[in-house]
């Protein structure tokens, strides 16, 4: 009898693990095979270390450009704003309701420093993203390397200096909702999801540190 109960307990525990409704990535290891880029590329880096993931993109050095322009008398641009993303494949059925919750630290919000989420990621030219800076939030649909759809609205941050944030991406099967620190900042309808690719986006001289991300099947 005791043996039978033990077997039933083991089966029940196994079933509960198999059908777990959430998974939390704490970056103690690269368990979801994020696309790390540790070397200094033309666009930026994405490194997992010390229990967090840090994404850095490059930007124009405006101060040096102004100085060189003044010295030479010729308009001089130093560097360029770059887009950089890193992604994994989320343990979710994206055609069913889900929530993704993540805690991040942003270096700075500015008009030329953008950050956000990529999702429905098929490859480097085909994905959706929510991104924002200090004055606006955008939803973009990328197809074959081109932006083919944009929904944008202005946003007023209560505290532009607050760089520790909680982001949530929620899908109820019909509507996509992007939430920052408990406040809904953009809602998008009629954008079906097909792919489980999910990640983070930076543009310009931006640095984003990700503490954790939780995938929840609703």
Identify the function of each model-found stretch.
Residues 19-43:
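Extracellular carbohydrate-recognition regions
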Residues 1-22:
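Bacterial Sec-dependent N-terminal signal peptides
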Residues 27, 211-215:
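Extracellular beta-strand elements of beta-rich domains used
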Residues 60-143:
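Secretory/extracellular carbohydrate-interaction modules
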